Amino acid sequence: MANIFNNEKIVIRGAREHNLKNIDLDIPRNKLVVISGLSGSGKSSLAFDTLFAEGQRRYMESLSSYARQFLGSMDKPDVDLIEGLSPAISIEQKSTNKNPRSTVGTITEIYDYYRLLYARAGHAHCPKCGREIKEQPVDQIIDSIMSWPEGTKIQVLAPVIRGKKGEHAKIIEDAQKSGFIRARIDGVMTSLDDSIKLDKQKKHTIEIVVDRIVLGPDVRKRLADSVETALQSANGIIVVTKRVEDKEVEVFFSQKNACPDCGISVPELQPRLFSFNNPFGACPECTGLGQKMEWDVKKIIPDSSKSFNEGALAFYNPESEWNHSMFQAVAEEGGFSLDTPVENLSKEQSDFLWNGGGENRKIHWIYKKQSGEGYSEYNRAWPGIISDMKRRYADAWGDAQRVRIEEKFMSVSHCSSCHGQRLRPEALGVTVGGKNIWELCCLSVSESIDFFSGLELSESESKIAAQVLKEIRARLKFLKDVGLDYLTLERAAETLSGGEAQRIRLATQIGSALTGVMYILDEPSIGLHQRDNQRLIDTLTYLRDQGNTVIVVEHDEQTLRTADFLVDIGPGAGIHGGRVVAAGTPEEVMKVAESKTGQYLAGTLRMEIPSERRKGNGQKIVLSGVTEHNLKNVSIEIPLGTFTCITGVSGSGKSTLMSDVLYPVLSNKIMRTSYPVGAYKEISGIENIDKVINIDQSPIGRTPRSNPATYVGVFDAIRDLFAATPEAKANGYQKGRFSFNVKGGRCENCQGSGTITIEMNFLPDVFITCDVCGGKRFNKETLDVTYKGKNINDVLNMTIEEACGFFVSIPHISRKLETLRSVGLGYIQLGQSALTLSGGEAQRVKLANELARVSTGKTLYIMDEPTTGLHFADVKQLMAVIQRLVEQGNTVLMIEHNLDVICQADYLIDLGPEGGFRGGNIIAKGTPEEVSSVKESYTGQFIKEMLDR
């Protein structure tokens, strides 16, 4: 076999990981290789679980035994042989950073360079008055003064008092004793021999005249003595006045970073001063998070038309004897009644209720004990509701009670000290190019590129910052190249979509400039508009041209056509996949009749465009005056009874419009939720729908216990079946025996999770397979019970498709399983951990759960890119489900980039024209045909190509 090995290809023989069927494959090295196929066909098993896993394992084995003991061992993939592997780097789309301290700037390391730039070339300003502060040694001060024109008349002043109340007699007396004869007091030149009496109730400024000099080549020694004397007298600060064209001009010099007016010192400019993750630079109030849990008045008083006795103060139960007695005393002292609606209280009364009246206004009340045995009498100052709630919060029993108080009565809001800017005032007072570091981070990537292109620095600053600026510009360009020019660097990492997070990591890899590496990417085009797709492809080909092998799992048509080598796995999903259906250039794959990908590229398979568009039921929801984030007073109409898509380039405002404004306002009004709502003017037409459901990509659970079976509600019915078997009845096993959430039938070593959680403190928790049950979750006695020859673990390990056949005779189970299969999830396991599901898979599980419910025909379904991770054939299947929902009278509103889906819509709302501050406008609306005729719409241009095919 030795002759099959060479440096030009990666050789795979006998790959059997997961559903792969003994695959043999040769992949060319240093090429752009795209792996395609239906969802669940085995693409990720080949790319990540075989190629990447083996690359990682070999790298680990190359380390010393000492290093390996900290990393643990990695299992060898189920494969006979892999040769020609390079060091592997995986860039997946589902590992979004949830750390609230992580931002786009920190994870791309651009913020580190910003910190360095501000520390080396920043201009400090007083955080109070805004005056620029410069630190200058004595020699530099003297050189600056001597550089003024010869013959200039100057005065050297020592500002011994700056804006302080008092008579300052001692200061004046000391100046006289030191031999000084003049001082400028409150701007007026005064002889120290005069009788000087200052008003002690007013603020004064006293500047001692140390010397008067006419500049010339022979005065340097005298000037130096005078400057040093003035600096010593005024604690490192001097004022020098000079005559310029009959005007007196003042120049301030400081030996330290201190404001001459306010006396506020600024610490030495170091990179750590600009880090919100370092106590030296972080805002002391919010510790650098930029936000805090604050008491929410709307939650404390949800209905201000009510009185205390009617329950206006949600934090206090009016039926509590203690609360009633105390507030009766508060009302008497405040001059109102407990039957007075809160909104009718005067400003004075309201202020007393909220903030108290100080130590002088005490309240007196008697608390009768519930037992009836005696009473307690109190006479104390009323601190106000806020202080009282803070005390009760601090005294809460344990974290659970504190969390309950936070959820019910508090909201996350911008820190009132730093206003969400995370840093201490001294750091925010430092500018480069007129902007402080936070203002710079608030610019989009494209705006930042423009800022640094026009940045003007002094000659010395340019030399110091040259290398830093080079790195910053390069990294910003990489972000732009992967289609993320609309992002701001202050954007929290936890708010990024999976696709955005992946493209950020891709940009970071470009910046590392590695060669000879095998990059493996998972659908980098997710969330990307067709307009930006070419830039992403250019990035992938750039990585390839640097001498790397780039392997991409992808469904995007343009990427598939660009591939040097295309591998199509299939032909179906799950047990029906796992084979190499076709491999070669895209043109070669198109000739393979069995390849659905090839037939799609060839145009043989396609989604038929509807011959007519639904007009809807004549009703509509109108949302107007939306100004949240970058939206520019946008107003939209959503025709009910239609399938409507919101389109636009990345960052144009789609998610803001749908997820931050429309969904929360509808949910709050219809479903009685209390989500924060973005800025808008008004909404109408809500009465035309009775339910709004947001089917998003958040996980269906956050622990290994959560799985599709429990989420859609079939696991209860399956446990009933097992409990009804003769074996279970003979042993007295009830339904609970087959639950991994309660004691009895579960494995107690892992408590039914199948894994043991190892807490890593500062790192994410690690899950390892339980060594007692081997990951089966249940104990041996429970696993001995079988239904149709399968135990409960066997059933949980079935794919949805296998389970559909297994439970075909049980309608209430098979109906729910069929909905999972209908949304393209036939390949996932019934008991598959929620932690292993991608965002797109989790979204489709939720969609299946909704499909299984009885439709009212007046529901608005909201979805954000449900085609994520879907092959063309899966998209076709999903669209049939979506159209079925609309046929039942419901409305579907969807954010989408997939052109096949967009062309299926009845109505489009296109936002743009660009992302970030250049977006936020409605560019086009109407049917796909109408939008395709709008030249300003990027979406319309691509739709036109699709419609013209």
Where are these regions (language model features)?
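Conserved phosphate-binding elements of NTP-dependent enzyme cores
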Residues: 1-949
